Amino acid sequence: MTTDTDPSLDAHLVVDQGTFRLDLTLRVAPGEVVALLGPNGAGKTTALRTLAGLAALTAGHVTLGGTDLDRPERRVWVPTERRPIGVVFQDYLLFPHLSALDNVAFGPRRHGVDRRAAREQAAGWLDRMGLADHARRKPRQLSGGQAQRVALARALAVDPALLLLDEPLAALDARTRLDTRAELQRHLGDHTGATLLVTHDPLDALVLADRLIIVEDGRVVQEGDAATITARPRTDYVARLVGLNLYRGAANGLTVLVGGTFPLATAEQHHGDVFVAFPPSAVALYPKRPDGSPRNTWPATISGIQRHGDNLRVQLDGPVGVAADITPLAAAHLHLVPGQAVWATVKATETRVYPCSG
């Protein structure tokens, strides 16, 4: 359950690291799960470390539940151990010399709970995670999925106002990730505090998060729910993330001029600066110019071929770069190889056009 009022987290993160500057505003409501996505070096982990108190703000503030945790201009800074925050790191960082039970009990103990009560709380959390029978095991005796659940239990055992998850599923194999993602979704649904999930995996974000924030070069480039972002990507990175070809151009009626030279026919009238998007599955390939050519037809050269699920993803160079998805049977029939010349077509009805502004 989410709310749009009284946000649990209200932060403006300005962090200078050499020539890189993170300048990011975050608001996360109680019960809301927000995913922070972006390419490597975008500033995602820096943001998480700053919220946790592991990196210093240059300017801005971190306010949680109405209380300032970090505000340089007022010389306010709350140490990491005193922040009501739970963190699950990418490699979990379980204490190797402690049992699963004592790893989870560490959080309550750090907050002043006596040893017996802390272990009782920890046992309850392990039971909720389905790990009651693993309480005495050391981290080296746990599978990746089990270690992830112990780390999550340790973070949740302190009843955090803010839960920070740094690539929590990245270290798992495909099968374990599938099962653990479903379990994580259930536990996040029960968490009443705010949750910020840092991930590079769009599936993790789409399954686990209520809202997505896309960061590139230290700044927010797009924000919204999954449906909005997947329907209207605004950068090349976001387009790749959601699996679309994306172009920016000038619209004049039913034509969009891309790059000042390449016209794309569309099915709806637009005017001014627009984005044009279409899925790789909308691109058809031919060995020669097809008869009765669709309005969008152009020569291209294959620059790469790779497997993409049950299909092949073909990268094309030409007037515009484009990705096309075709079946292995179609690729064999066309004898496709890198460097080969082909013709690409896209129906106007397959394109999606929307304004650059708004």
Q: Can you say where each PLM-predicted feature lies in the sequence?
A:
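ABC ATPase nucleotide-binding domain helices that frame the ATP-binding cleft
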Residues: 45-48, 150
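Conserved ABC transporter NBD signature motif
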Residues: 60-72
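C-terminal boundary and immediately downstream tail of ABC-type ATPase nucleotide-binding domains
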Residues: 12, 230-253, 277, 296
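Helix-to-loop junction immediately C-terminal to a conserved catalytic motif
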Residues: 52
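The feature captures the beta-strand-to-loop junction immediately N-terminal to the Walker
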Residues: 37-39
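Pre-Walker A (P-loop) beta-loop-beta motif of ABC nucleotide-binding domains
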Residues: 24-35, 95
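ABC ATPase nucleotide-binding domains
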Residues: 84-86, 94, 99-234
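Glycine/charge-rich catalytic "coupling/switch" loops of P-loop NTPases
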Residues: 259-306, 328-358
